[in-house]
Amino acid sequence: MNPRVLQLKKEIEGQRNILLSHPVYAQIKDLAGLRLFSQIHVFAVWDFMSLLKSLQSTLTSVSLPWMPVGSAETRYLINEIVLGEECDVDENGLRMSHFELYLKAMKQMGADTSMLDKFLKNVINGESLFQSIKNADIQIGRAHV
């Protein structure tokens, strides 16, 4: 692994441990609890990818004709993260994005994806993010059972 990445991992280890001991994990006691958690957390997974693609668009070159933009180290870091997020591998060796893999796992455990499905449909149909959230009736904290 890249020495800088190893250094960053070491630097954030304390914060990572705080996140890993977050009380939300104690609330997930069974499959039903995991389903409920995933119905909301999937939006964070989607949002992370959207943020990452925004960073890629801003900090690297994604337009044509291609020209090098910004710091090569920054481009490398962003594109390495994009590669990992867009090219995950499932248990059968099939490539898919981390988001698609998460959605597949949700469906396998019987989690309700209707809020996400409505939201994505609204976004695809050109609604703003805020209108898409409103029209999908996304209710944080009240996931569907």
Predicted region positions:
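Short, well-ordered alpha-helical segments
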Residues: 70-76
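Active-site-proximal alpha-helical scaffolds that flank and shape metal-associated catalytic sites
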Residues: 76-142
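Alpha-helical bundle segments that constitute or directly flank the non-heme di-iron/ferroxidase center
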Residues: 4-20, 29-67, 84-89, 140-142
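Flexible, glycine- and charge-enriched loops at secondary-structure boundaries
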Residues: 5, 71, 95
